[in-house]
Amino acid sequence: MALRGGHAAAAAGVSSGSEDDDEEAGFSRSYFLAKEKEPSSGKKRARAAGKLSDLNLVDEQVLRASLAEIPPKHEREVEALTRSYKEQYRNWLFELRCGFGLLMYGFGSKKMLLEDFASTTLSDFTVIVVNGYLPSINLKQVIVTIAEIFWEQTKLKRKRQTATRSQLQPFASQSIDDIISFLNNQTSDNGDDNVCLLIHNIDGPALRDAESQQYLAQVSCCPQVHVVASVDHVNAPLLWDKKMVHTQFKWSWYHVPTFAPYKVEGVFYPLILASGGHAQTMKTALVVLQSLTPNAQSVFRVLAEYQLAHEKEEGMHFSSLYTKCRERFLVSSQVTLNSHLTEFKDHDLVKIRKHSDGQDCLHIPLVSDALEKLLQELT
């Protein structure tokens, strides 16, 4: 019996070994078959050379309408979260009165939350709302508005009922530094004289430059001005240095994820998978041009200026462009100009049209307004 068992074990071992060999051989065959079916390196390069502009993108309005039809989820949980934030309103008000600025961050739109806080809790403040998510903001006008509010309050205190609106006009003609100096001199023990600057997205595209942030920081230092703001960009803290954070804004950070959709804020941002029209095309063109050499940018500017000056023409002849670029010492030969034009055409910055005389002419596929704005941004 033992002998039979030994033979059985040996047979099992042989069988197991042969199965392993077969499996390994099968794996090897599968590997080489897969390699044979892989596309060649040339095909890989061709596929990698595909551009986003080659895709058939859905119209932006259709895409936004579809997004609006998506039903909200976890409504009860979101409502409970919002209620927990509302319970902190008194603490927020206390910190605001103590001279701190409130900075709200976290996933989701905080627009409704902040406006609810302002309408229910800041009744003793004059609230000025700044929509930082807008593409452009007149920051000086915001500061002028604050100054006019204090001027009105001063006028009421002194009972100067005869004062006319024209007395407020000098603020608009003054520099921002002068207006901030005026604000710094406004002091009062009356809580009703406080102004709250409510900034939705202080990290918005129109407020991201250093100058705007410096002015906002200086305004936040004014005795009667308080700041409540929200941020959404992951790199928002990089907008401020240590002095701005701790001695000017004096931020008190609050993590308040609302998970609310960015319905209002998102209107001003183009959707990646949508054909966003002239505004998005202009932004894309600007990004591409900024990555090119100054000489290439100057060549593009020559073509753009010609197109703006001759809107009714079909385009600019290559010979005319070459002559103008030679006059400005931008190119030394047609080969150099051709290399620039090839780069423009690869990025869809320039199209070639057939002129009525049969010659090829160059055309930038942007409407005049977008082209003018592009040239302004490029300087």
Curated annotation (Swiss-Prot):
GO molecular function: DNA replication origin binding
UniProt entry keywords in alphabetical sequence: DNA replication, Nucleus
Main location: nucleus
PANTHER family per record: ORIGIN RECOGNITION COMPLEX SUBUNIT 2
Organism: Oryza sativa subsp. japonica
Record text on subunit structure and interactions: Component of the origin recognition complex (ORC) composed of at least ORC1, ORC2, ORC3, ORC4, ORC5 and ORC6. ORC is regulated in a cell-cycle and development dependent manner. It is sequentially assembled at the exit from anaphase of mitosis and disassembled as cells enter S phase.
Tissue distribution: Mostly expressed in roots, seedling and inflorescence meristem, and, to a lower extent, in mature leaves and shoot. Higher levels in inflorescence meristem than in shoot apical meristem (SAM).
Known role: Essential protein. Component of the origin recognition complex (ORC) that binds origins of replication. DNA-binding is ATP-dependent, however specific DNA sequences that define origins of replication have not been identified so far. ORC is required to assemble the pre-replication complex necessary to initiate DNA replication.
Cell compartments where the protein resides: Nucleus
Annotated InterPro entries: ORC2 (IPR007220), RecA-like_ORC2 (IPR056772), WHD_ORC2 (IPR056773)
Pfam families xref list: RecA-like_ORC2, WHD_ORC2
Composition bias type Low complexity, residue spans: 8-17
Protein name: Origin of replication complex subunit 2
GO biological process: DNA replication
GO cellular component, one term: nuclear origin of replication recognition complex
Recorded superkingdom: Eukaryota
Spans annotated as Disordered: 1-25
Family per similarity comment: Belongs to the ORC2 family.
